[in-house]
């Protein structure tokens, strides 16, 4: 009985550490996938890259990453209505949504091209990857 009561706290601590490691590992994999998709998308020169989208990256400095990812995912979801739905945009949307708030405000007035939007998102994700 004495040995079991000593093992329980140790096992709980190990379980907590393992789940933190797995979450961090999955997070890095998601960021790597996003960067890979962004590299592929920004190398393309099709008409979809010239679409005008909201510039969600002009948000105030104190905006959280989850809020920025939510806004970026919202922009990507809106692109689907322009017949630009390809597997990389869908995958990018799915991965960003998994890292984002469920809802967010979209008050941006400034606009940019989809290509510029994706380039800026790539820089943000690369910084996040190297920080993490």
From Swiss-Prot:
GO molecular function: cytokine activity; growth factor activity; interleukin-4 receptor binding
Disulfide bond among keywords: yes
InterPro entries, per database record: 4_helix_cytokine-like_core, IL-4, IL-4/IL-13, IL-4/IL-13_CS
Any Gene Ontology biological process: positive regulation of MHC class II biosynthetic process
Paired cysteines (S-S): 48-84, 70-104
Superkingdom as given in the UniProt entry: Eukaryota
Annotated compartments: Secreted
SUPFAM superfamilies the record matches: 4-helical cytokines (SSF47266)
Statement: the UniProt record of this protein carries the keyword Oxidoreductase: no
Predominant location: secreted
Pfam annotation, one family: IL4
Keywords associated with the record: B-cell activation, Cytokine, Disulfide bond, Glycoprotein, Growth factor, Secreted, Signal
One of the record's GO cellular component terms: extracellular space
Signal sequence range: 1-24
Glycosylated residues in this chain: 28, 45, 62, 83, 95, 101
Role: Participates in at least several B-cell activation processes as well as of other cell types. It is a costimulator of DNA-synthesis. It induces the expression of class II MHC molecules on resting B-cells. It enhances both secretion and cell surface expression of IgE and IgG1. It also regulates the expression of the low affinity Fc receptor for IgE (CD23) on both lymphocytes and monocytes. Positively regulates IL31RA expression in macrophages. Stimulates autophagy in dendritic cells by interfering with mTORC1 signaling and through the induction of RUFY4.
Family: Belongs to the IL-4/IL-13 family.
Name of the protein in question: Interleukin-4
Gene source species: Canis lupus familiaris (Dog)
Gene of this entry: IL4
């Amino acid at each position: 009985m004495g040995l079991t009561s000593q093992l329980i706290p140790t096992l709980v601590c190990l379980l907590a550490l393992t789940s933190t490691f797995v979450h961090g590992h999955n997070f890095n994999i998601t960021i790597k996938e996003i960067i890979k998709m962004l590299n592929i998308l920004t190398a393309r020169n099709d008409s979809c890259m010239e679409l005008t989208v909201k510039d969600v990256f002009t948000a105030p400095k104190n905006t959280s990453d989850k809020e920025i990812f939510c806004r970026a995912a919202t922009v990507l979801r809106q692109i689907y209505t322009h017949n630009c739905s390809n597997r990389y945009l869908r995958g990018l949307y799915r991965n960003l949504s998994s890292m984002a708030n469920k809802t967010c405000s979209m008050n941006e007035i400034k606009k940019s091209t989809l290509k510029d939007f994706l380039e800026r998102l790539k820089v943000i994700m690369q910084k996040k990857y190297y920080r993490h």
